[in-house]
Amino acid sequence: VSLEDYTAFSSRFTSTAGATGKGTASLRKAFSSANVIDLFILESATDTQLQKASISFKNDLLAAIDIKKMITDDVVVNDGLIRTVDLVITASVDKRFEGIEGTITPQIARKVQNYFLSTNRDFGEPLILADLNRVIFELSDVRYASVDNLDKDIHIEFNEIIQLNNLVINISLV
């Protein structure tokens, strides 16, 4: 059983209450705890948001893993960390959209929200601004876009996941 197996199992697991979540596995690096597997878990709150896993979810997960794990492995369930991000995006569009800019804003919002869906993000995955811009540029009406409130990419630890909190979209006519 590999760490990838534990990660896949925890991310596909459904509790007795029907809850799902997302997880990642890590092996402790101390000689005395060489067979201790740390699972970092978050439970799905909605289709777009994760939350700290409930005790019942963790208990169900541990019980399900206990049947599948190697006998020498000791699995410990920990809470994953959610790093929320607020974004202010300015998108430049052609002047021909003057008066109807409001039709482009929801399209951009949908693209950004899909980018941050919990099914599209992984633990330890950084927020690369160029990738986010690339997603926005898939809209043919957008000439240019920038994230105004971030100067650089956001890098996180292996047990953290980035989640969108607030989104503000400004439209600039060019």
Q: How would you label these PLM feature ranges?
A:
Residues V1-E125, L132, L173-V174:
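Carbohydrate-recognition loop of C-type lectin domains
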Residues F31-A34, F137-S140, I162:
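A structural signal for short secondary-structure junctions
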Residues G80, D86, S92, S118, ...:
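Immediate N-terminus of the mature polypeptide
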Residues K111-H155:
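C-terminal structured "cap/appendage" subdomains that terminate the fold
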